[in-house]
Amino acid sequence: MTRFRPNIVVSDVFGSAGDVTAHHRDGKTYLRKRSRPVHPMTEAQAAHLEVHRRALAAWREVPDTEKERWNAYAREVEPHRPPFDHSSWLSGQNLFVSAYHGFFTLGHEHVPEAQRFEKFPPFAVKVCSGVEVEGKLVLGFSVAGLEYADASRYWVYGKLQVVMAGAGKGNAPWKSVLAAGPCSVSPVELIVPNWREVWDMDWDSFQLHGQVVLLDALNGYRSQKHRLSALVELK
């Protein structure tokens, strides 16, 4: 990585531009160029790329007056990456593409209308159960913090990894999973078909690592990521 050296014009850099991403370590900033692996994309990665291309194509068809609304709403949104000091904001295209991806994930792909980003209620997610049903891993999650919100508009969406009990995150595949129902249903269930083949798993006790967000079914937006790790013993 190349170290970034501050100057009188630019004191620091954050986020990504093109194939370069800024990383901060021990008070220093480094610029790392994104690697471009030679191996082909997985089927899931190729599908995700196609959705992204459709989102960008849809954005190009949005009238200029509507783009101005998206840009105005985007300036009110705190980015999901640092700095978290209100000194930076999203573009209207960022917000539009985020909503497009969200609706696609929820099974309702369409061109979204410009809507203000509503702050998500503070919430916490905890793994509370795990069972195997006809070769499917059914994970039960409890979601706290939505007691005074309309929980039916929020859906849990997570990237999950299963490894040997007690192990940290490794090279095992990550599986993206949308909950079987909204957060108004308790427990919230995330179901992984053929999970033993996905993770080459023979044990009934394992470590689950995850990154989860809430998706808002009204506007397609997503919350900040919550990371979790839990020991799961199948019942």
How should each PLM-predicted stretch be described?
Residues 1-126:
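Long, polar/Ser/Thr-enriched low-complexity segments
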